[in-house]
Amino acid sequence: IKDPAPLATLLVDPAVLKVLHSGSEDLEVFQRWLGVLPQPLFDTQRAAALLGLGFGLGYRALVQEICAVDLPKGETCSDWLQRPLTESQCEYAGLDVTWLQRVWRELHEQCVRQDKLQWVLADGRDATSALGTEVDGFHRRIKTAWKLNRRQLGNLVAVCQWREDTARSRDKPRSWIIDD
């Protein structure tokens, strides 16, 4: 993308619903690259959980559940940071986009029927609000951090900051440096 300004404008347009699946990493990319966070936001993974389809349901499993389509998983672990993307990666990404609209439509309809649409949209607002206000709070993602004493928590904060700095300098995902 040579000029990202139109994308940034679209992401903040309140008249356009943005649909993501498990979008936390996407939100960070938008914030760092474009300086914006999308609103309104419908996260299909969170919607599926609210509808009782399963907590943390992966995209492939959700497409299988809703569309009865078995997506290939061959490119799941490929290097998505390399450029140009391979033809196989482009096809894989295209399939993701192809099925996302159908998944969204079904989940949206279920949310409306069960009176949960506002819950999903509020969850999207919460996700972007939390990210928008978090300053170097990467240690908060560690689920067991609450068990640590002050010294251990200080060490965790230092390691998380090192991981963040290293990931940025290498232009790699945090999980490739040290997983949560």
Predicted regions and their residues:
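Short acidic-hydrophobic catalytic motif
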Residues: 163
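Conserved DEDDh/DEDDy metal-dependent 3′-5′ exonuclease domain
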Residues: 1-110
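Mixed-charge, glycine-rich, non-catalytic linkers/tails in nucleic-acid processing enzymes
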Residues: 87-160, 172-180
